[in-house]
Structure formats: structure tokens, C-alpha cells
A protein has these predicted regions:
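Bacterial Sec-dependent N-terminal signal peptides
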Residues: 1-22
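Generic alpha-helix detector with strongest preference for long hydrophobic helices that associate
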Residues: 4-7, 28, 32, 91
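Short alpha-helical "patches" and their helix-cap loops
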Residues: 5, 67-71
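Intrinsically disordered, low-complexity repeat segments enriched in small/polar residues
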Residues: 5, 9-10, 39, 63, ...
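Intrinsically disordered, low-complexity regions enriched in small/polar residues
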Residues: 12-15, 25, 29, 51, ...
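Immediate post-signal-peptide N-terminus of mature secreted/exported proteins
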Residues: 20-67
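Surface-exposed, polar helix/loop patches in the mature regions of secreted/periplasmic/lumenal proteins
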Residues: 71-156
């Protein structure tokens, strides 16, 4: 299912999808997971983060940018999905590692989101809401340039 979604998103991205098509697909898929009682806790927590992040992205973009393009929202949504997929695959791989190694890997992802802000938002209560709890499966900043964050993580994990 994930592979299909990523392939679909990539196909739409490269074919010049209609306005906000990728953003809408990622958002709607996350909402479907949240609204499906059969979704497991892990899937629901990841979906909740995606919905929160995409809602924040759209709201902040319209607040701070004179002109928000569909491409801007689509690119961020695409790289958010790529980042989350890569994060999940790295967590699965790290099951065989020590708890310290696993925590170090999570910190690489967390640091990439904090170190690559998109808007420079100073409202730490909002942007770090998923970090401050300390128990989140997705301990990431909402104010993130997902394309840069993904590149930063991949560079560190080479």
C-alpha cells in the first residue's frame, strides 16, 4: 500500500498534477487512516502527525507568503511523505540495534526537522508540539522544509 501511494504521488508529481493534487492525496489518505477504526495505533499516530503538519503548512503559508502556489504545497507534501516513509523504514531496520543506536537514529531525524525550518516560526509551543510530549512516534517540528530535512537525513545516514 505504501509503495503504491508513493508511486502514485511520484507519478502525479512528475506528470504535472492538477492544483494541489499531491497535497490533497496525502492529506486525504491520512484522514482516511484516522477515520478508520481498524487502523492500528501506529498508523493512526503517523496519520495524525501528517494531518497536523499539512494543516499547519497550509495555514502558515497563507499567513506568511504573499502568493502560495499549488506547487509549493505539493512539493512539501511529497517530501513529507518521503521523509515519513524513510523514517519508518529506518526504524524497522534499527530493531536489531541497541536502544542507544536506535535513539541516535531518531535524533538524526528530529534534528533534521528542527534544523531546516520552512517559515522561521517562533511559536515553539505549536511547532514543537510533537517533540515536547516525549512519547510521540513522530517527534518532529511542524515548521520544517521537508525537502531539505530529507536530504539532511540521507546525508547523515550514508
Amino acid at each position: 500500500m505504501k509503495a503504491f501511494l508513493i508511486t502514485l504521488i511520484f507519478a502525479l508529481f512528475t506528470m504535472g498534477a492538477t492544483a494541489q493534487e499531491i497535497y490533497k492525496i496525502v492529506y486525504q489518505n491520512a484522514e482516511q487512516v484516522l477515520n478508520n477504526p481498524a487502523s492500528g495505533v501506529t498508523k493512526a499516530r503517523i496519520a495524525q502527525f501528517k494531518v497536523s503538519q499539512l494543516t499547519y503548512l497550509r495555514q502558515k503559508a497563507f499567513e506568511t507568503m504573499p502568493e502560495v502556489t499549488d506547487r509549493f504545497l505539493d512539493v512539501q507534501a511529497y517530501y513529507l511523505s518521503e521523509f515519513m516513509t524513510f523514517y519508518q523504514s529506518e526504524l524497522v531496520k534499527s530493531n536489531k540495534e541497541t536502544p542507544e543506536e536506535r535513539a541516535k537514529k531518531v535524533m538524526i531525524f528530529l534534528d533534521a526537522t528542527v534544523s531546516n525550518p520552512l517559515f522561521g516560526d517562533t511559536d515553539e509551543e505549536t511547532i514543537y508540539a510533537y517533540i515536547k510530549e516525549g512519547t510521540e512516534l513522530t517527534p518532529f517540528s511542524l515548521d520544517t522544509d521537508w525537502q531539505k530535512a530529507l536530504a539532511a537525513v540521507k546525508a547523515q545516514l550514508k
